Regions:
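Juxtamembrane and boundary regions of transmembrane helices in multi-pass small-molecule transporters
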Residues: 2-79, 170-185, 335-338, 342, ...
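Transmembrane alpha-helix interface/packing and boundary motifs in multi-pass membrane proteins
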Residues: 216-222, 305-314, 345-357, 582-597, ...
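Interfacial loop-to-helix junctions that mark the boundaries of transmembrane helices
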Residues: 42-50, 195-202, 220-226, 249-260, ...
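Structural signature of hydrophobic alpha-helical transmembrane segments
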Residues: 197-209, 256-269, 311, 315-319, ...
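Hydrophobic alpha-helical transmembrane segments
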Residues: 208-209, 227-231, 261-262, 296-304, ...
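Membrane-embedded alpha-helical segments and adjacent helix-loop junctions characteristic
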Residues: 246-338, 534-612, 617
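Flexible hinge motifs at transmembrane-helix junctions and intramembrane kinks/re-entrant loops
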Residues: 214-234, 406-409, 472-476, 483-508, ...
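Beta-strand-enriched, solvent-exposed domains that form extended recognition/catalytic surfaces
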Residues: 65-196
Length: 689
């Protein structure tokens, strides 16, 4: 065992009282106490006052707008039926000279998006024109918008277009919408008329500033992450209000994907109840037992256990329940605790990539209605992700072993002092522990598949004493609830069997089943351990992303991306789009939480699919690989990383941003190369869409 010649300044261990909810409430400032204390008191005071003034100014502006600007009225709606070879007129007032018309009905959405592929046969044509009061003289008219009708008369799709009329109504002139039939059968369409649509140019700038503001607040940790998302989402609504498009409360709530929140809430409930049984501590001790106390076999089994549990019980939850016992295990074996915890965080992120419930990004993607409509379910998701995740995990562990084979045993003076302090606090072993030690020593060495470490009997007996399964009946109930959930997910993957058993509902009902079986009269204890701020953070991001979408940001980005893609050969467009989405998501995740990146990039994926002939599924897989593997790039990439760092800080171990980055970022690049190769082979070579 080596001692570093220049050990870092000691960090005192602090107790974090209350429920586990407080782990997320703590900001990343706690992780950077050293940097904060280097600032003078005067500088910190100036920064604090400046921050308060900006936030108060923002609050005042939002409050004023909310009070002054009422929620927008719904667009004018009308049902239009046109007989064969006839034209129908609808009068419209155009105060701003622009109107957005949406048509709902049996329209061919694809051919209207890509008119170069149609055969010139249109069902109707629509234009906006300025005419006289007798409707027989046209002073100005827009270009004809040709409507391609769907061969399926029961289809109900929506297409939209903005029209600008340079000459408005007045005097003998009036603006009308003309719908002309071009087929031998009647045409019936539901028409929505919005005479005050958003103009894209300035709106895109506002949207860009909103996203930049959110990134700055989170990256520089100006305020709590959840509050940052809430205040920026509120600002987005205020901007829409200034533009006379403020949504009402019902519309705002409809922007939230409650299916993903139900999934995360249910998993949090199940895992926190399971944690009271002691099963997670028992499993960590089990990894020590099967590794016979040998350091690298232990790290391998612990990494695989973390990845497996993260896949099915969520990486954030596993970070909460596995970190404390892992710290104790590292101290018992004299391993460099911070290194082991970073490795654990990396495998939690990679394991979480395997299933829809493995981490928040996967939950956000797989519960989206458009993704579900593409046939993405539990079994389908696991089958697509499994090869890439397995290869990445084994390659990463090999690299970790080669690069940190010796450094994992190099302890700094601070860890030595902590270990010495806690060694002195230990109580003498009980008689039961002594008997267990004697039993382990008497076991024939030949019965071990791996030669035990020198202090293996004493360490194992000490770990077993305080880390047993405390409530076996409750553990059985937890297994029943989980079995119900996974059975329903598998059945949902079979066509026409349990079609309504979506991920969110299944996990939520499994949580309710566990609460019923647990039979506790007081539900407060269960609700207190739910990480409500994570759920609120994600809900605020849903609202913000929808507001940014309404401001035209994703459409603007999509148009420019399509301009680039059209310069490529058609057979290369899917591959380039997939790689672009994969690496952009991963690199953004280095600086901001992967859940936030996922919500924005998912919107971008839909825009790309609507503007170019690119299948959606490859973009879903690219997004999930990029968000999950990209979370390994830095301490801020995933919530689970921060949770591990904060729990480590409780126990006296500091994992700095730089410490995590040095280990995690190169490994992230390796996993991204693996993910890129896998996606190119699967979707470009094999066309596995």
């Amino acid at each position: 065992m080596k001692i570093l010649s220049n050990p870092p300044r000691p960090i005192s261990s602090r107790y974090l009282g209350g429920s586990r909810l407080q782990v997320w409430r703590r900001t990343r400032t706690d992780v950077h106490d050293d940097e904060v204390h280097r600032l003078s008191d005067r500088s910190r005071k100036i920064i604090h006052i400046t921050k308060m003034c900006i936030l108060l100014l923002l609050w005042f502006a939002c409050t004023f707008i909310v009070f002054v600007f009422a929620a927008e009225e719904k667009p004018r709606s009308t049902m239009v039926t046109v007989m064969p070879n006839k034209t129908v007129f609808r009068k419209v007032d155009l105060p701003n000279g622009v109107v957005r018309i949406s048509l709902l009905g049996p329209v061919d959405w694809y051919l209207m998006r890509f008119p170069e592929e149609d055969n010139g046969e249109y069902g109707a044509g629509l234009r906006v024109e300025c005419v006289n009061s007798d409707l027989n003289v046209s002073y100005h008219r827009s270009d004809m918008w040709n409507i391609v009708m769907n061969s399926d008369s029961t289809a109900y799709l929506e297409v939209s277009r903005n029209f600008i009329l340079h000459e408005g109504s007045g005097g003998d002139r009036q603006a009308v919408i003309s719908l002309e039939s071009k087929q031998d059968s009647p045409v019936s369409l539901h028409m929505l008329i919005n005479t005050n649509p958003l103009i894209t140019n300035m709106c895109v700038l506002y949207a860009g500033l909103l996203i930049l503001g959110l990134y700055m607040l989170i990256i520089f940790d100006v305020i709590d992450h959840t509050f940052a998302a809430l205040i920026i989402a509120t600002t987005a609504i205020a901007i829409l209000g200034l533009l006379e498009h403020r949504p009402n409360v019902h519309t705002i709530i409809s922007h939230v994907n409650f299916e993903s929140l139900m999934l995360l809430f249910g998993l949090m409930t199940i895992v926190d109840i399971m944690a009271t049984t002691g099963v997670f501590e028992y499993l960590v001790v089990w990894t020590y037992r099967i590794s016979r106390g040998r350091p690298w076999p232990l790290i391998f089994f612990l990494s695989m256990l973390t990845a497996f549990l993260s896949a099915f019980l969520n990486s954030d939850n596993m970070a909460l329940v596995l970190t404390p016992i892992t710290i104790r295990l590292c101290e018992e074996m004299s391993l460099r605790t911070a290194y082991v915890l970073v490795i654990m965080a990396i495998f939690a992120d990679m394991g979480g990539a395997l299933t829809p419930m493995g981490n928040p990004p996967n939950a956000i993607v797989t519960t989206n209605p458009a993704v579900v409509a593409e046939g993405v379910d539990f079994v389908n998701f696991v089958i697509h992700m499994l090869p890439g995740v397995l290869v990445a995990m084994f390659v990463v562990f090999g690299i970790v072993y080669v690069t940190h084979r010796k450094s994992i045993f190099v302890l700094d003076q601070h860890q030595l002092d902590l270990m010495k302090e806690r060694e002195g606090e230990k109580a003498p072993p009980s008689q039961e522990t002594q008997d267990r030690i004697a039993q382990l020593k008497d076991k024939e060495p030949g019965r071990y598949w791996l030669k035990p470490a020198e202090n293996y009997p004493e360490t194992l007996a000490g770990l077993e004493e305080g880390n047993r399964i405390r409530d076996k009946p409750l553990l059985i109930k937890c297994c029943i609830a989980l079995s119900f959930a996974f059975l329903c997910m598998i059945l949902h993957s079979i066509p026409k069997v349990a079609d309504g058993a979506t991920l969110g509902w299944v996990v939520l009902l499994a949580a309710f089943l566990l609460i019923i079986l647990d039979d506790k009269s007081d539900l407060n204890a269960t609700l207190e351990i739910i990480q409500w701020t994570i759920l609120l953070f994600i809900a605020a991001l849903f609202v913000l992303s929808e507001a940014v979408d309404q401001l035209g940001f994703f459409e603007w980005i999509g148009d420019r991306t399509v301009m680039f893609l059209t310069s490529l050969e058609p057979q290369h467009q899917t591959a380039v789009t997939t790689m672009l989405l994969l690496w952009t998501t991963a690199l953004l995740t280095v600086f901001i939480d992967n859940a936030a990146v996922t919500i924005f990039m998912l919107k971008f994926s839909f825009q790309m699919a609507s503007k170019d002939d690119i299948p959606l599924p490859p973009m879903f897989w690219a997004l999930t690989f990029g968000a999950c593997f990209g979370g390994n790039g830095s301490l801020f990439g995933a919530v689970s990383n921060e949770i591990i760092a904060l729990i480590a800080l409780q126990h006296g171990y500091k994992i700095s941003f730089w410490h995590f980055f040095v280990i995690g970022f190169p490994l992230m690049l390796v996993t991204m190369v693996i993910g890129s190769a896998y996606l190119l082979i699967a979707h470009s070579v094999l066309s596995w869409n």
